[in-house]
């Protein structure tokens, strides 16, 4: 199918662009969409011609406020006519008639954003479509604050993280962030549930706080996000961890049960590549990259017990060629291929299913998956027991004739 603009013509007072997505090469049918534009060149109405279950056209009105924001009011789509292509100049009446007849909904056929009266133009309130939200005064409300040190609701802890060794990270709760150091967005949804999002000066989320009210008591469910000096995410501390933190105390990822069971921890090399990931309840997973920043080796905790590494070796174009398991002795914190570009090349190497590898030697390698590109010569080179004739091309009159060089750049 192709999207081909076939008309750009003025009609009435508005220009429009008609696009047809053909479903076959006869161009006898297809999906047609028309977009009308106002005098300023902004889309004002989109029509999906004849796409409803009764071949009616689906209309999508687009309106703007005084500052040309198209999301201040987002009208619901409606069906009208039979394969109609003309712009509906009285869409508000058509919209009201459609929803009143089909859904008994007579007002508020749109969602609405209410903006604050400031040059920042931030959203203050959001209403969903339908009159029920209005009658219940149920909207999503936003307010914009800053943190206050020591305040029960607007306080944010400050952390210091150090790496003691390859598998140990120490976390220290170093008091509170200074007042007005962080921006806070308070969100109250339609059910009066409140979420606070704290961001630093680099627009990074450092704390997400969900306030829970239960039998007159209030609980802050805090998720902290910790970054290093290079803005890399170092740790995520969910509520099960943050609830047990005490100001002035230090915690080790090896000895703290809550950190080991619930925290997300990350390690990086000198090039800011993530070389270590610790998920809740899991051992560290290590990653090793080559000079071209391609992931070559990875190892889970279970593989580490067996002395195994998982490898994925690319060709010169960066395409994965062979994947499997090996038993190399690798120190992920002293990368042996840091300054080496690893690549695969097609040969008649039967042990690696038709590939030879430069840049790294594989010990006791077991290839689990091999991928081939560009042509079908691998049938002669991969050393498998598959009969070559079973992989030969068979012409079929129901399909187009094969173009012999069409596989260039593709996986075969």
Predicted features along the sequence, with ranges:
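Beta-strand elements of repeat-based all-beta scaffolds
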Residues: 2-412
């Amino acid at each position: 199918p192709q999207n081909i603009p076939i008309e750009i013509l003025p009609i009435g007072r508005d220009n429009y662009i008609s696009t047809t997505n053909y479903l076959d090469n006869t161009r006898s049918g297809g999906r047609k969409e028309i977009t009308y534009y106002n005098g300023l060149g902004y889309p004002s109405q989109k029509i999906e011609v004849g796409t409803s279950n009764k071949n009616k056209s689906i209309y999508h009105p687009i309106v703007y406020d005084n500052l040309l924001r198209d999301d201040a009011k987002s009208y619901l789509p409606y069906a009208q006519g039979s394969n109609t292509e003309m712009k509906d100049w009285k869409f508000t009446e058509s919209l009201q008639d459609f929803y009143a007849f089909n859904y008994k909904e007579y007002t508020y056929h749109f969602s609405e954003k209410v903006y604050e009266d400031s040059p920042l133009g931030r959203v203050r309130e959001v209403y969903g479509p339908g009159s029920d939200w209005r009658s219940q005064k149920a909207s999503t409300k936003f307010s914009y604050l800053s943190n206050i040190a020591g305040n029960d609701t607007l306080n944010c802890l400050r952390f210091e993280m150090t790496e003691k060794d390859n598998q140990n990270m120490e976390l220290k709760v170093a008091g509170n962030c200074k007042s007005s150091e962080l921006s806070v967005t308070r969100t109250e949804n339609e059910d009066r549930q409140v979420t606070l999002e704290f961001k630093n000066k680099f627009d990074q989320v450092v704390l997400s706080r969900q306030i829970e009210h239960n039998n007159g008591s209030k609980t802050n469910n805090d998720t902290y996000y910790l970054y290093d000096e290079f803005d890399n995410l170092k740790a995520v501390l969910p509520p099960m961890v943050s609830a047990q933190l005490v100001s002035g105390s230090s915690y080790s990822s090896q000895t703290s049960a809550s950190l080991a069971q619930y925290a997300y921890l990350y390690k990086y090399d000198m090039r800011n590549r993530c070389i270590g990931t610790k998920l809740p309840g899991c051992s560290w997973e290590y990653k090793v990259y080559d000079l071209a920043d391609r992931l070559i080796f990875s190892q889970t905790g279970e593989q580490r017990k067996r002395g195994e590494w998982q490898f994925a070796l690319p060709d010169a174009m960066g395409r994965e060629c062979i994947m499997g398991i090996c038993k190399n002795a690798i120190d992920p914190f002293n990368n042996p291929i840091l300054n080496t570009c690893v690549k695969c090349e097609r040969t008649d190497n039967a042990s690696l299913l038709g590939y030879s590898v430069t840049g790294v030697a594989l010990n006791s390698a077991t290839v689990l998956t091999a991928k081939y590109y560009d042509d079908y010569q691998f049938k002669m080179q991969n050393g498998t027991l598959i009969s070559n004739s079973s992989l030969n091309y068979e012409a079929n009159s129901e399909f187009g004739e094969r173009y012999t060089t069409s596989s260039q750049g593709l996986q075969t």
